[in-house]
């Protein structure tokens, strides 16, 4: 079994890696919706915002977050 964390590593109440929002697991919907967003966004300057990169959440044994301090 492979363990891929990277930007998809997130800690929740179950402290699991590999899914962005582990607390929302298995909440599938049977309806299909499409959203179209049309517009112009402002220029994003990375220096003005904190960028999330899964800090403090790394894959350990059995694809669990190590340490779980998110």
UniProtKB/Swiss-Prot annotation:
Keywords for the protein's UniProt record, in alphabetical order: Metal-binding, Metal-thiolate cluster
Signal peptide: none
Classification via InterPro entries: Metalthion_15p
Lineage top rank: taxon: Eukaryota
GO MF annotation: an example: metal ion binding
Pfam families registered for this protein in UniProt: Metallothio_2 (PF01439)
Family membership: Belongs to the metallothionein superfamily. Type 15 family.
PANTHER family: METALLOTHIONEIN-LIKE PROTEIN 1, METALLOTHIONEIN-LIKE PROTEIN 2A
Annotated function: Metallothioneins have a high content of cysteine residues that bind various heavy metals.
Annotated protein name in UniProt: Metallothionein-like protein 1
Source species of the chain: Festuca rubra
Lineage, uppermost ranks: Eukaryota, Viridiplantae, Streptophyta, Embryophyta, Tracheophyta
Gene that encodes it: MT1
């Amino acid at each position: 079994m492979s363990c891929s964390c990277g930007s998809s590593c997130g800690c929740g109440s179950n402290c699991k890696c590999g899914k962005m929002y582990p607390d929302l697991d298995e909440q599938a919907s049977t309806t299909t919706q499409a959203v179209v967003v049309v517009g112009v966004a402002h220029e994003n300057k990375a220096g003005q915002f904190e960028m999330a990169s899964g800090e403090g959440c790394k894959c350990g044994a059995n694809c669990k977050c190590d340490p779980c301090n998110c």
